[in-house]
Amino acid sequence: MSFTRRKFVLGMGTVIFFTGSASSLLANTRQEKEVRYAMIHDESRCNGCNICARACRKTNHVPAQGSRLSIAHIPVTDNDNETQYHFFRQSCQHCEDAPCIDVCPTGASWRDEQGIVRVEKSQCIGCSYCIGACPYQVRYLNPVTKVADKCDFCAESRLAKGFPPICVSACPEHALIFGREDSPEIQAWLQQNKYYQYQLPGAGKPHLYRRFGQHLIKKENV
């Protein structure tokens, strides 16, 4: 895969933009001989409404004190009339070599055969080691069940029933695409679009792909 090593800093992370053919990605995926799921967030389509996050909260019974998913509104430029925002999805990246898995003392944090990083609730002892180890800070301790929770692509609530993650179905702007990483839809999108991946130190390769986009929002008169 060809890529432009143009980087910018979002917090303490590194962003690398990729362009061109995704054929090498497809080849690597086939060599693994595993079904790997991936998600695409098209920031050029996202309007920052957070309908996806609200749908996630309802479907997965996320308490008010926790969050599996949110869309951060990052101001880029600002003037008297309008602000330019970058709408950035904050959720588990299902990264390879995930530090949350490495630190879990009971094996409750694990990766399934589809590449989804999950939490086995019956094995979680609520020690919060995984929460502290996650560089993206996208895990939380459920105050009711006392177990760690995070985005798992709706593995039990939706995928097991043959439905895509609720955030994908709920998005009014069709800014989210989900499927097998080697599927024609995902591969075609990666071939046809310039995208990036956001990776923090200490974490492996993410399985969340992003198309960069910014939006000018006019300020209302007060």
UniProtKB/Swiss-Prot annotation:
PTM field: Exported by the Tat system. The position of the signal peptide cleavage has not been experimentally proven. Can also be exported by the Sec system.
Keyword terms, alphabetized: 4Fe-4S, Iron, Iron-sulfur, Metal-binding, Repeat, Signal
PROSITE patterns reported for this sequence: 4FE4S_FER_1 (PS00198), 4FE4S_FER_2 (PS51379)
Family annotation (InterPro entries): 4Fe4S_Fe-S-bd, 4Fe4S_Fe_S_CS, ET_IronSulfur_Cluster-Binding
Chain positions recorded as [4Fe-4S] cluster 2 binding sites: 56, 151, 154, 167
Signal peptide: 1-27
Chain residues that bind [4Fe-4S] cluster 3: 92, 95, 100, 134
Residues in 4Fe-4S ferredoxin-type domain copies: 37-67, 83-114, 115-144
UniProt induction comment: Up-regulated by the oxygen-responsive transcription factor FNR under anaerobic conditions. Repressed in the presence of nitrate or nitrite via the two-component systems NarXL and NarPQ, respectively.
Pfam families: Fer4_11
Single GO MF annotation: 4 iron, 4 sulfur cluster binding
Residues that coordinate or bind [4Fe-4S] cluster 1: 46, 49, 52, 171
Annotated binding of [4Fe-4S] cluster 4, by residue: 104, 124, 127, 130
Gene Ontology, cellular component aspect: outer membrane-bounded periplasmic space
Coiled coil: none
Protein name as it appears in the record: Uncharacterized ferredoxin-like protein YdhX
Gene: ydhX
